[in-house]
């Protein structure tokens, strides 16, 4: 049973790492954490793995390089996803080779983000805290806005309804720009991530 619990925890951690490093908002969250480290709003030993316990200064000296790495990865993710979205939108004009190339570009950008996470040496617990934050600040507002948009679309047109619908759509577009994937893929991916995260937490409590 103990082996089974350890295996479930390992599977959850691996899946959480993989799935959280697919989103376009993830590099920004990592940069926010680096800012907190630099401003001493977060304890070093809570954020960074034991590898740097005896060499904190060396890690802090790398902060500018880490930020540049994350900015590059964020740009790469956004550009790759924009290219894929454009081809999918004009699928009739796109060749299978172009689509495969764009999909590969997105996958490569996500692989680069996963590698960036490893280079940052953040603890697993910190990654899970960021998942909680994304759940509160991105996922829940997103599905709430989607549901409200559906409700308003079914109502009769009025000044109040039209104004609220326009505001909801504007806020949804702002959130969509942070995802790095289609809304449907985001919901599916985040829900899978969240379920995996909870399985790992439940296994640890046993």
Give each language-model segment a name.
Residues 1-206:
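Transcription initiation cofactors for RNA polymerase, centered on bacterial
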């Amino acid at each position: 049973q103990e082996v089974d619990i350890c295996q479930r925890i390992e599977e959850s951690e691996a899946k959480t790492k993989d799935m959280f490093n697919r989103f376009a908002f993830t590099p920004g969250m990592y940069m926010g954490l680096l800012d907190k480290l630099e401003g001493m709003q977060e304890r070093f030993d809570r954020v960074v793995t034991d590898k740097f316990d005896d060499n904190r200064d060396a890690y802090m000296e790398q902060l500018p390089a880490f930020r540049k790495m994350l900015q590059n990865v964020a740009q790469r993710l956004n550009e790759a996803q924009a290219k894929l979205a454009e081809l999918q939108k004009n699928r009739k004009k796109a060749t299978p080779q172009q689509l495969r190339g764009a999909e590969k570009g997105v996958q490569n950008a996500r692989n680069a983000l996963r590698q960036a996470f490893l280079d940052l040496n953040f603890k697993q617990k910190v990654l899970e805290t960021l998942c909680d934050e994304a759940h509160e600040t991105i996922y829940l507002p997103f599905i709430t806005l989607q549901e409200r948009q559906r409700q308003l679309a079914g109502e009769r047109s009025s000044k109040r309804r039209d104004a609220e619908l326009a505001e909801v759509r504007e806020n949804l577009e702002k959130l969509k720009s942070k995802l790095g994937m289609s809304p449907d893929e985001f919901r599916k991916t985040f829900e899978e991530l969240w379920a995996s995260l909870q399985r790992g937490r439940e296994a640890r409590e046993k």
